[in-house]
Swiss-Prot record:
Stored HAMAP family: Azoreductase_type1 (MF_01216)
The protein's name: FMN-dependent NADH:quinone oxidoreductase
Transmembrane segments: none
InterPro entries recorded: Flavodoxin_fold, Flavoprotein-like_sf, FMN-dep_NADH:Q_OxRdtase_AzoR1, NADH:quinone_OxRdtase_FMN_depd
Cofactor(s) essential for the protein: FMN
MF terms (GO), sorted A to Z: electron transfer activity; FMN binding; oxidoreductase activity, acting on NAD(P)H as acceptor; oxidoreductase activity, acting on NAD(P)H, quinone or similar compound as acceptor
Assembly notes: Homodimer.
Keywords: Flavoprotein, FMN, NAD, Oxidoreductase
Catalytic activity field: 2 a quinone + NADH + H(+) = 2 a 1,4-benzosemiquinone + NAD(+); N,N-dimethyl-1,4-phenylenediamine + anthranilate + 2 NAD(+) = 2-(4-dimethylaminophenyl)diazenylbenzoate + 2 NADH + 2 H(+)
EC number in record: 1.6.5.-, 1.7.1.17
Length: 208
């Protein structure tokens, strides 16, 4: 049995979002193929997720802890942010497989997804500094990145390259990409392009 972590990084539903629709299509196929696997879904836009962002409170809390302060001496807000940040790091570390689904907005990933990426790019946990340079501490995981783009980029856009680079940096060597592309540029081909992407999502669900 494997553990799959799903990171949903779009505030809309599958009826309104192509990336979420592809994610749901993938999950339906994956559940059918892997009925005993554990699946955790992290919706970075859900209020209950309480996604921490690196801000003054978090930075000052880390500084105090590095200086030897006890966790209990931090403010209540600082304790909550540090604890939640650590929980998300541990959640990623416990997963065997990771699926990330997001739109490309303004040539980049959504800000909430960037905040989540910060929680998995942690010195001493997912990578370490050595005399030879940074070394990954994460191994044995694989990832699937689902992204919707209005035009055709074929994985050469900054957003998908950023996700792949971070995952590679911390040791996730296998990062596959599923892109829902071109629908805004070619609305007359919308049905064809969307159906092609959903077919690929179904296939990934069977093989991932």
């Amino acid at each position: 049995m494997s553990k799959l972590l799903v990171v949903k990084a779009h505030p809309l539903t599958k009826e309104e979002s192509r990336s979420v629709r592809a994610l749901e299509t993938f999950l339906a196929s994956y559940r059918e193929t892997n009925p005993s696997d554990e699946i955790e879904i992290l919706d970075v836009y859900a209020p209950e997720t309480n996604m921490p962002e690196i801000d003054e409170e978090l930075l000052s809390a880390w500084g105090a802890l590095r200086a030897g302060a006890a966790f209990e001496t931090l403010s209540e807000n600082q304790q909550q942010k540090v604890a939640r940040f650590n929980e998300l790091t541990d959640q990623f570390l416990s997963a065997d497989k990771v699926v990330i689904a997001n739109p490309m907005w303004n040539l980049n990933v959504p800000t909430r997804l960037k905040a989540w990426v910060d929680t998995i790019n942690v010195a001493g946990k997912t990578f370490q500094y050595t005399a030879e340079g940074p070394k990954p501490l994460t191994s044995g995981k694989k990832a699937l990145h689902i992204q919707s783009n209005g035009g055709f980029y074929e994985g050469k856009d900054f957003a998908s390259q950023y996700i792949k680079a971070i995952l590679n940096f911390i040791g996730v060597d296998q990062v596959d990409g599923l892109f829902i592309e071109g629908i805004d540029h070619f609305p007359d081909r919308a049905e064809e392009l969307l159906n092609t992407a959903m077919t690929k999502a179904t296939e990934y669900g069977k093989t991932f």
